[in-house]
A protein has these predicted regions:
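C-terminal ends of transmembrane helices
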Residues: 85-96, 157-161, 222-230, 285-293
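Juxtamembrane transmembrane-helix termini in multi-pass membrane transport proteins
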Residues: 4, 10, 69-116
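A small-residue-rich subset of transmembrane alpha-helices
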Residues: 101-131, 198-250
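Membrane-interfacial catalytic/cofactor-binding modules of polytopic membrane enzymes
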Residues: 159-201
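Hydrophobic cores of alpha-helical transmembrane segments in multi-pass inner/ER membrane proteins
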Residues: 81-83, 146-158, 216, 275-286
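Histidine-/acidic- and/or cysteine-rich, low-complexity loops and terminal segments associated
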Residues: 2-74, 97-100, 137-139, 162-178, ...
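Membrane-interfacial entry segments at the cytosolic side of transmembrane helices
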Residues: 136-145, 232-241, 269-272
Length: 295
């Protein structure tokens, strides 16, 4: 009788030893994700009103393109990593059940890299669109900007948006799980594509809103709410109403001032205080979502 109990005890200790590295990795991944996002937001806030300069007035596929894409990647890291953290941690938890901790850790970052690659590539399409608009007309008319906001608002309630939002919220491990580490790249791409389908027009509206940090923060909160709250349709429909109404006002009132324009005139001290409060809220929401999804 003692021998089986001893084996059970040893097995229990071994199981605990196997779980501890996974738990530590879980925490390390969360800290690194939020640290990267924090650093990216610091860059955006430090740039202040100059963020829009390399992103709103490109001239050719050269240095301007590189500057645009670099700032686009920073923006994606700042805005999308906090919203993707729950899915990343869920991926790591499941992968760690069938692989060694080190393999699960590497696969998780392959998943993250593939996810960010989708958003980085979307920057090429965004640059091409801005370049075409700049060639046609130096500054988009207020009416066109208003129509862009209205289209983005209408998209919020379309079946395609709802399907992509549902797939973006649903753990990919439930539908497309593969045990090989190499497949982590494919799963990251797939998750990125669904998130792109869900959020792409929310990034398009940043251009008519002036690419201000305030507009980026507002869009981040919309995406975070759509991906983490229990009733995401309230966020989507609320954003739809605001975008359609504000876009309509821009169409009928061309001289309407930009709601987010004043953010670019805030002092560094105000930005620091505002950013600290906002980031605490983002961290709280992301941490709650991560705990819920990984559990």
């Amino acid at each position: 009788m003692a021998k089986p109990l001893l084996l059970v005890a040893l097995g229990g200790y071994r199981a605990v030893d196997e779980v501890r590295p996974v738990s530590r990795q879980h925490n390390v991944i969360l800290v690194l994700l939020l640290a990267l996002a924090t650093a990216a937001w610091a860059v955006l806030v430090w740039q202040g009103h100059d963020v829009s300069m390399p992103m709103a007035s490109p001239t050719a596929w050269g240095l301007d393109a590189l500057l645009f894409l670099a700032m686009w990647v920073v923006m994606m890291v700042a805005m999308m990593l906090p919203t993707a953290a729950p899915m990343v941690l869920a991926f790591h938890s499941v992968h760690a059940r069938n692989h060694q901790p080190d393999d699960a850790f590497r696969a998780t970052w392959v998943f993250v890299a593939a996810y960010l690659l989708v958003w980085a590539l979307s920057g090429i399409a965004a640059y091409a669109g801005v370049l075409a608009a700049a060639a046609a007309q130096p500054m988009l008319a207020a009416e066109v900007n208003g129509l862009i906001l209205m289209v983005a608002g209408i998209y919020q309630i379309t079946p395609l948006k709802q399907r992509c939002r549902s797939e973006c919220r649903r753990p990919i491990i439930m539908t497309s799980w593969h045990h090989r580490t190499a497949d982590a790249f494919h799963m990251g791409l797939l998750h990125g594509v669904y998130c792109l389908g869900c959020c792409w027009l929310l990034f398009v509206i940043l251009f008519p809103l002036g690419m201000t940090t305030g507009a980026m923060a507002a869009v981040t909160f919309i995406i975070l709410g759509e991906k983490t709250l229990r009733r995401p349709e309230f966020v989507s429909y609320g954003a739809a109403v605001v975008l359609v109404l504000y876009g309509g006002l821009m169409v009928v009132t061309p001289g309407l001032p930009a709601v987010f324009g004043f953010f670019g005139r805030l002092s560094e001290d105000v930005w620091f205080r505002l950013g600290l409060v906002v980031w605490i809220i983002v961290l709280f929401i992301a941490a709650r979502a991560c705990t819920h999804k990984s559990g």
